[in-house]
């Protein structure tokens, strides 16, 4: 990580992967983070990255339903967010983050039901997935050897089919992808 000044970090990653005998295109990613306030450890982060994904062996060959004609997914993702961390050593620690993201993916692989009663993957020409993710983690010391840990997250993730209809009866263009939840939340303790 390059730090042009003490509170700012910049990272550039260039990645290429081999899948069988085929190489991915170069997959760049740029990450920037900056400390806004040392009190509360408030940090702003942003990134831009290229996405590329080969179909999995299940996508291609699962029986029944695999689709050996699938194309590779590719696209770009942008995100930005804030994080914080506060606490008192040996007493408690609270961490949280809020992140906005925006992805434009071509040939998104989605498993859909068939008329034969099983699911099969298909490529969705253009998908726009965007939203926010909120995370929080709390640790509280209850006694000398006891600690309570709670963490949770909430995601709002519209994933919209912006491609072309796959058939004359396809009414999914402009709508949320099926089997991809728009809202999700978890709490663990």
Model-derived regions: residue spans:
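Transmembrane beta-strands of outer-membrane beta-barrel pores
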Residues: 14-20, 48-54, 61-63, 86, ...
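Outer-membrane beta-barrel translocator domains and adjoining extracellular loop/strand segments
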Residues: 22-28, 57-63, 107-117, 157-171
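Hydrophobic, lipid-facing positions within transmembrane beta-strands of outer-membrane proteins
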Residues: 12-14, 26-30, 66-68, 76-80, ...
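Membrane-embedded beta-barrel scaffold of Gram-negative outer-membrane proteins
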Residues: 35-37, 43-45, 72-143
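Gram-negative outer-membrane beta-barrel transporters
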Residues: 3-9, 95-104, 123-189
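Signature of Gram-negative outer-membrane beta-barrel scaffolds
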Residues: 1-39
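Extracellular loop and loop/strand-boundary signature of outer-membrane beta-barrel proteins
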Residues: 13-18, 62-68, 117-124, 168-176
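Short glycine/proline-enriched turns and hinge-like loops at secondary-structure junctions
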Residues: 22-26, 92-93, 146-148
């Amino acid at each position: 990580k390059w730090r042009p000044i003490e509170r700012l970090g910049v990272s550039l990653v260039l990645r290429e992967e081999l899948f069988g005998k085929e190489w991915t295109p170069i997959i760049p990613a740029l990450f920037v983070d900056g400390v806004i306030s040392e009190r509360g450890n408030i940090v702003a982060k942003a990134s831009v990255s290229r996405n590329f994904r080969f179909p999995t062996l299940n996508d291609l060959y699962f029986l029944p339903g695999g689709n050996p004609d699938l194309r590779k997914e590719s696209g770009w993702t942008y995100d930005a967010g804030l994080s914080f961390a506060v606490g008192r050593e040996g007493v408690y620690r609270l961490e949280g983050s809020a992140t906005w993201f925006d992805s434009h993916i071509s040939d998104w692989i989605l498993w859909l039901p068939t008329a034969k009663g099983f699911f099969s993957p298909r490529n969705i020409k253009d998908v726009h997935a965007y939203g926010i993710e909120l995370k929080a983690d709390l640790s509280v010391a209850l006694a000398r050897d006891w600690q309570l840990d709670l963490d949770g997250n909430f995601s709002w993730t519209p994933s919209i089919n912006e491609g072309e209809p796959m058939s004359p009866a396809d009414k999914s263009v402009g709508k949320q992808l099926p089997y991809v939840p728009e809202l999700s939340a978890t709490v663990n303790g």
